């Protein structure tokens, strides 16, 4: 299976452990960054990882930030993505079986690496259980977003914000 991964500057170390874990299980990993602890914007990497799934280049996605909240929200802005923020294996299973989630987000600073690995295993092994009710729910979710043609696949989409950051336009932590 091809898995698209991405993270923010808070958890690149966790992302690399997850990448190695996935590879050890025989998966191909598309790493969308970030690669270091230099302050950056999580929407860049949530969007990049999600677009690989939406385009069909990857089968599923795993994204991480400190809590998983921000990066899951950014991934969910990509048409065709159903990203679920998960902190336990039961939620991972539910997200896949009933909502056909194609991306999971995990908080790398609040969830231990062993549990993250278990969550990923359950998510990858779970199978969607199509029912009329599930299909109607998913259809409704998928119809909530209309892609801005200037956004999808546009690697320069965040340039304005990055320039503002580089020029001191945002407060440093």
From Swiss-Prot:
Q: Care to name a GO molecular-function term for this sequence? A: galactose-6-phosphate isomerase activity
Family matches, as InterPro entries:
LacB (IPR004784), RpiB_LacA_LacB (IPR003500), RpiB_LacA_LacB_sf (IPR036569)
Q: Provide one Gene Ontology biological process annotation.
A: lactose catabolic process via tagatose-6-phosphate
The reactions it catalyses are: aldehydo-D-galactose 6-phosphate = keto-D-tagatose 6-phosphate
Q: What's a Pfam family in this record?
A: LacAB_rpiB
The entry's keywords: Isomerase, Lactose metabolism
Q: In which pathway does it act?
A: Carbohydrate metabolism; D-galactose 6-phosphate degradation; D-tagatose 6-phosphate from D-galactose 6-phosphate: step 1/1
Q: Which EC numbers characterise this protein's activity in its record?
A: 5.3.1.26
SUPFAM superfamilies reported in the protein's UniProt record: Ribose/Galactose isomerase RpiB/AlsB
What domain of life does the native source organism fall in? Answer: Bacteria
Give the record's family classification.
Answer: Belongs to the LacAB/RpiB family.
Q: How does it assemble?
A: Heteromultimeric protein consisting of LacA and LacB.
Q: What is the name of the protein in this document?
A: Galactose-6-phosphate isomerase subunit LacB
Q: Which organism is it from?
A: Clostridium acetobutylicum (strain ATCC 824 / DSM 792 / JCM 1419 / IAM 19013 / LMG 5710 / NBRC 13948 / NRRL B-527 / VKM B-1787 / 2291 / W)
**Organism lineage string:** Bacteria, Bacillati, Bacillota, Clostridia, Eubacteriales
Name the gene: lacB
